[in-house]
């Protein structure tokens, strides 16, 4: 069995926009990946609403900082064959740029590639996924913590 850790934010968690709860597992992208890959693979979903790459929240401190929790996730789910990281959108909510978010992803990537050997027989493969583009209409709603300037910055992701 191949183990794949998916480390991300609300898009990995399955957040339904507008605060309407969580998508069923089969609807989330991790569930779709599990279905497509089949029984020889186990998708490990590590999504957290509001998670950033490496930045503390001015309101919640390090609770949502992806760097603070990645190593524990790598260790608790070992051995891993692959790690998928999809983070960066929430960095923009705290006035960081797409470039800074990409640097944060590089830091996380190095943690996977360098730290995994401590508890894995081999270094897992790494897939770094660009955050999804946020719709302009979402940035303009009162419920969105992403400003219009954050929306424009998000377009700089691949």
How should these model regions be labeled?
Residues 39, 64-158:
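Alpha-helical cap/lid subdomain in secreted, periplasmic
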Residues 14, 52-55, 135-140:
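Short acidic/His/Gly/Ser-rich catalytic and metal-binding motifs that mark active-site loops
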């Amino acid at each position: 069995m191949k183990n794949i850790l998916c480390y991300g934010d609300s898009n990995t968690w399955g957040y339904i926009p507008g605060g309407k709860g969580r998508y069923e597992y089969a609807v989330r992208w991790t569930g779709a990946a599990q279905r497509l890959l089949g029984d020889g693979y186990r998708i490990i979903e590590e999504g957290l609403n509001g998670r950033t790459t490496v930045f503390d929240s001015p309101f919640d401190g390090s609770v949502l900082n992806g760097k603070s929790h990645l190593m524990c996730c790598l260790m608790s789910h070992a051995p891993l064959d692959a790690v998928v990281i999809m983070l960066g959108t929430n960095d923009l909510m705290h006035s960081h740029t797409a470039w800074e978010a990409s640097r944060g992803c590089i830091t996380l990537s190095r943690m996977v590639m360098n730290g995994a050997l401590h508890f894995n027989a081999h270094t897992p493969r790494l897939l770094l996924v660009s955050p999804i583009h946020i719709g302009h209409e979402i940035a303009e709603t009162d419920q969105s913590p992403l400003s219009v300037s954050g929306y424009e910055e998000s377009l700089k992701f691949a």
